[in-house]
From Swiss-Prot:
Its EC number is 3.6.1.7. It comes from the Bacteria. SUPFAM superfamilies: Acylphosphatase/BLUF domain-like. The active site is at R18, N36. The gene is acyP. This is Acylphosphatase. It catalyses: an acyl phosphate + H2O = a carboxylate + phosphate + H(+). NCBIfam families: PRK14450.1. Residues 3-91 form the Acylphosphatase-like domain. Keywords: Hydrolase. InterPro entries: Acylphosphatase-like_dom, Acylphosphatase-like_dom_sf, Acylphosphatase_CS. PROSITE patterns: ACYLPHOSPHATASE_1 (PS00150), ACYLPHOSPHATASE_3 (PS51160).
Length: 91
């Protein structure tokens, strides 16, 4: 199992980005969370699962849902914790 941490930047709040993220992560069998950051222009995403699924997920994060305008995605790979049983939207 692998863990992807991403900060997605751009017009990603108020455009259903977190819901899109949860839908795609669930479809790919990933666990973790998506959370709006306080600056209003970034979403933090942590996802754990199969590396191939995570790479596909990362490509989806780069495009986002139709109303989003993704400018940049900062990524890092971490040690998976297996602390997540599903994919959630954090508030």
């Amino acid at each position: 199992m692998h863990c992807l941490r991403a900060i997605v930047k751009g017009k990603v709040q108020g455009v259903y980005f977190r819901d899109f993220t949860r839908t795609q992560a669930t479809r790919l069998g990933l666990c973790g969370y998506a959370k709006n950051l306080a600056n209003g222009a970034e979403v933090e995403v942590v996802a754990e699962g199969d590396k191939d699924a995570l790479l596909e997920f990362l490509n989806l994060l780069r495009s986002g849902p139709p109303r989003a305008e993704v400018k940049d995605v900062e990524t890092g790979w971490e040690t998976a914790t297996a602390n997540y049983s599903d994919f959630r939207i954090k508030h």
